[in-house]
A protein has these predicted regions:
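Conserved thiamine diphosphate
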Residues: 1-118, 132
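Short glycine-centered, acidic/aromatic-flanked micro-motifs in structured strand/loop junctions
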Residues: 14-16, 126, 150-153
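A conditional alpha-helix N-cap/helix-loop micro-motif detector
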Residues: 26, 50, 127, 155-159
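Short, surface-exposed connector motifs at secondary-structure boundaries
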Residues: 38-41, 116-120, 143-146, 169-171
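Acidic/histidine-rich
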Residues: 123-130
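Generic long, charged, amphipathic alpha-helical segments
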Residues: 131-170
């Protein structure tokens, strides 16, 4: 903006993760985009639900200001059976979530039932498709004292939102 005197609403959908596809498939280097971040010049997101992906694109178009949006898009999430959203998640009463709490807290989820917030012993923070790997490992170990938090927006980092969520877990 300051260099060219123009705001850009550019959206880059970048493949992320080799996922065993071989050398002919590219992988966006997330760390390189994060190195270019300064002064809230761009937004970098790594969405793990269809609704959050939708709301990130919707937010990009409806904001009063323009910043480039970098979206990391691993192909494996397209086929992941746990990577789903309900129709209600796409409505206007919902919005983009910079941080998502554990799916196990959603009523009606077919996941392990976690203990109350005060009795949670470990909080794991992650971003992207690794969440579903961690979820599967927790299900296998039947650990109901571990919660997994997903950081969906990597830059600008949602420190206040994350601090508010972490405050619930006393241990």
């Amino acid at each position: 903006e300051s260099k060219w005197g123009r705001a850009s609403g550019l959206v880059l959908l970048l493949p992320h993760g080799y996922e065993g596809q071989g050398p002919e498939h590219s992988s966006a280097r997330l760390e390189r985009f994060l190195q270019m971040c300064a002064g809230e010049n761009i937004q970098v997101v790594n969405c793990t639900t269809p609704a959050n992906y939708f709301h990130a694109l919707r937010r990009q178009m409806h904001r009063a200001f323009r910043k480039p949006l970098i979206v990391m898009t691993p192909k494996s999430l397209l086929r992941n059976k746990r990577c789903v959203s309900s129709i209600d998640d796409f409505t206007k009463k919902n919005s983009f979530h910079r941080v998502l709490e554990d799916h196990a807290y959603i009523k009606g989820s077919k996941m392990i039932e976690l203990t109350k917030d005060k009795k949670i012993e470990k909080v794991v923070m992650c971003s992207g498709k690794i969440y579903f790997d961690l979820l599967e490992a927790r299900e296998k170990s039947k650990n109901n004292r571990l919660t997994i938090i997903r950081i969906e927006q990597l830059y600008p980092f949602p420190a206040k939102t994350l601090a508010k969520i972490l405050k619930k877990y006393e241990n």
